Amino acid sequence: MFKPVVKSRSSRSFCYLAGCLAMVAATLSSTAQAKSEWACPEGFTPKAGLNTDFPSDGKKRAFVVVPPKDSAGGAPVWVPMVGTVEATNWNLNVPRSGNNAKLAEHGYMVISPVRQCAEQDPNLGAGACNGVGKDGWTWNPWNDGRAPDASGDKYKTDAGDDVRFLEAMVRCVGTKWKLDRKRLFLGGISAGGTMTNRALLFDSEFWAGGMPISGEWYSTKDDGSTVPFQETRKMVAAAPAKIWQGRVGPYPLPSKLDPMVVITVWGGEKDLWDCGPPLGLCSDYRPTTQASSNYFSSISNVVHVACSATHGHMWPQVNTDAFNLWALNTMASHPKGSSPKDFKLTAPPEGYSCKIGRFTDHYK
């Protein structure tokens, strides 16, 4: 005969206590997880202004912090990056070079990394940063694209030092200032734009989006092999809607990314780069921005905005401050995890033409 089991008072008390302990454990776990979002290397404390000797991948790195003014709650983050020939401090404070520190006046936490080749000097322009890369990398300022020979094969799957440094830098700054975890953005011009592409491709779990300005894609054939520069231009021009593999990211390119918003900027007909003798003209940002826009637009949970202008191969020159603020507010309007169908594109400042999706003005 079945007899119901009647729990004693002590057993009921134990179950109640166990339930309470489970709830406490869950709360503590959640709190610990929130705290673990922000962490510094042991003994390092971030500060406003220039931070040096930040340990990352066995190296000492530097970055500049410009805290937000009058930011309510967690501040959205903007990480601007220079290219080959301009200094970090120019990018922060000189209108021609970006004037990005001004965004702190609008509530953004601005964190500007110093290139490894600059040896922690935020005032170094070209110098040692202007040249061909080494140790498996294509170009010198950032570890942004793998070399076309066997030395670069490792970086088909390894993100590289700079991708890890950028994330570690932001996580450390978050230990001192309250940051908005769903609004972490980065961007850059030229090699800085290429570095933006690489970070978004390898680390989409961390970033909410970015703005590559005239960045490289280092387009390749489907098998990942490289063709000469002039042939690459013809290759993309012959199939401008194709998804091109690129040495900027993993090989093969990921079929999925975490939700993000990406604004790709093309500087128009004069958006070219001459590497000087003996190389000469070595990059055309028409095919590179076309290829990047094709890829990001093909990922269902990524919002891609294609912007064209006429400033050439520079940080956007027309209404610079207004464009920067428009771009950051556009990205901030789409925090990480937002549905692409809810995204609304507002009109950019005068001098820019922007649309959702891939570029359709590059090739007629």
From Swiss-Prot:
Recorded effect of pH on activity: Optimum pH is 8.0.
**Signal sequence residues:** 1-34
Fetch the SUPFAM superfamilies from UniProt. alpha/beta-Hydrolases
Catalytic site = S190 (charge relay system), S293 (charge relay system)
Question: Is Signal one of the keywords UniProt gives this record?
Answer: yes
Give the primary localization class.
Answer: periplasm
EC numbers: 3.7.1.7
Supply the InterPro entries for this chain. AB_hydrolase_fold, Plant_Biomass_Hydrol_Est
Q: Where in the cell is it found?
A: Periplasm
Which GO molecular function entries does the Swiss-Prot or TrEMBL record give?
beta-diketone hydrolase activity
UniProt keyword terms in alphabetical order: Hydrolase, Periplasm, Signal
* Thermal response of activity: Optimum temperature is 37 degrees Celsius.
In its keyword annotation, does this UniProt entry include Signal?
Answer: yes
What catalytic activity does the UniProt entry give for this protein?
Answer: nonane-4,6-dione + H2O = pentan-2-one + butanoate + H(+)
Q: What class of enzyme is it?
A: hydrolase
Looking at the UniProt record for this protein, which Gene Ontology cellular component terms does it annotate, in alphabetical order?
periplasmic space
Q: Which domain of life is it from?
A: Bacteria
Q: Quaternary arrangement and interactors, per the entry?
A: Monomer.
Q: Which PANTHER family does this chain map to? A: FERULOYL ESTERASE, UNNAMED PRODUCT-RELATED
State the function annotated in the UniProt record. Catalyzes the hydrolysis of 4,6-nonanedione, a beta-diketone compound. Also mediates hydrolysis of oxidized polyvinyl alcohol (PVA) in the second step in the degradation of polyvinyl alcohol. Not active toward the monoketone structure.
The entry sums up its family as follows: Belongs to the peptidase S9A family.
Supply the name of the protein: Oxidized polyvinyl alcohol hydrolase
- Organism from which the protein derives: Sphingopyxis sp. (strain 113P3)
Designated gene of the protein: oph
